[in-house]
């Protein structure tokens, strides 16, 4: 069993809103697996939902470029958000983006290799670690992009439509964070898990009900889940009366793909013991 650390309990508490003891008990029962603990807490009715997107900890910037039916998005990480706002870091990000775009790179490894000297120079100057983490390249009849500050970036490709529509949809993706393009893209495994959680949460409600009624209840929950997870089924942020897929169709367009980056998603950042850090600094001044 994985060690149940204070950091793990804290993360589960932040992601579920439950008390510290409840979170610790759930982690112990789940053998230290935080995702299983969340599923168990949902199944027991302790929580209705939890954002299961992993730890978002690293700092840095997202950058995008769209030109001539092509789009590129990259993520460059720093240790602090302060550095991400500095001109030297911004210049490194832009130069990396432009190089990758102009060389039509589709993988991050060649960019990391070619930018290593510049990266080392930046690290030496700023005193923080800097890394080019990832990139994605897209091509399409219409390509749109949206950048929310420096922390969230989106690329969208359309068949038909125009750049303004693509940008609107990209903005929606940034705000709503869909998991997949359409319901057909949701895995059977994920649907089965959602069904299992629904049955456990509603065991009392469905007890004694006819099988066809239970099936309709399950179908309703799954349809709701698919709508929440799928871009084309989500209510458009600018007009919730219209689904994103219908918005595209009305404009004579079809959404082909989307890519959404958020700074640091899935990267675990080391916990800082500020009390120990201050104590160490005080001790150092007394030497």
UniProtKB/Swiss-Prot annotation:
Keyword Flavoprotein attributed: no
GO annotation, cellular component aspect: cytoplasm
Entry keyword set: Cytoplasm, Elongation factor, Protein biosynthesis
Subcellular location per the Swiss-Prot or TrEMBL entry: Cytoplasm
Region (Involved in Mg(2+) ion dislocation from EF-Tu): 80-83
GO MF annotations in UniProt: translation elongation factor activity
HAMAP family membership: EF_Ts
Family: Belongs to the EF-Ts family.
Physiological role: Associates with the EF-Tu.GDP complex and induces the exchange of GDP to GTP. It remains bound to the aminoacyl-tRNA.EF-Tu.GTP complex up to the GTP hydrolysis stage on the ribosome.
Name of the protein described by the UniProt record: Elongation factor Ts
Organism: Stutzerimonas stutzeri (strain A1501) (Pseudomonas stutzeri)
Gene expressing this chain: tsf
């Amino acid at each position: 069993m994985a060690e149940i650390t204070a950091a793990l309990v804290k993360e589960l508490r932040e992601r579920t809103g439950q008390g510290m003891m409840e979170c610790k008990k759930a982690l112990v029962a789940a053998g230290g697996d935080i995702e299983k603990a969340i599923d168990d807490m949902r199944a027991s009715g302790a929580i209705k939902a939890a954002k299961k997107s992993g730890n978002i900890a690293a700092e840095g910037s997202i950058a995008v470029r769209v030109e001539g039916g092509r789009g590129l998005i990259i993520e460059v990480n720093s240790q602090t958000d302060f550095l991400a706002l500095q001109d030297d870091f911004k210049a490194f990000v832009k130069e990396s983006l432009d190089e990758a775009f102009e060389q039509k790179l589709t993988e991050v490894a060649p960019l990391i290799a070619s930018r290593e000297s510049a990266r080392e120079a930046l690290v030496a100057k700023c005193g923080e670690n800097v890394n080019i983490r990832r990139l994605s390249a897209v091509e399409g009849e219409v390509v749109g992009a949206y950048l929310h500050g420096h922390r969230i970036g989106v690329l969208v490709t359309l068949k038909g439509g125009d750049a303004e529509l693509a940008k609107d949809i990209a903005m929606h993706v940034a705000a709503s964070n869909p998991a997949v393009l359409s319901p057909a893209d949701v895995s059977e495994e994920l649907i089965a898990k959602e069904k299992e959680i629904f049955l456990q949460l509603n065991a009392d409600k469905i007890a004694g009900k006819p099988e066809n009624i239970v099936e309709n209840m399950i179908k309703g929950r799954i349809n709701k889940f698919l709508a929440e997870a799928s871009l084309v089924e989500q209510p458009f942020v600018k007009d919730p009366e219209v689904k994103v897929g219908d918005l595209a169709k009305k404009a004579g367009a079809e959404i082909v793909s989307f890519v959404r980056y958020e700074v640091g998603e899935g990267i675990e950042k080391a916990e800082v013991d500020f009390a120990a850090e201050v104590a160490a600094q005080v001790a150092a001044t007394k030497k």
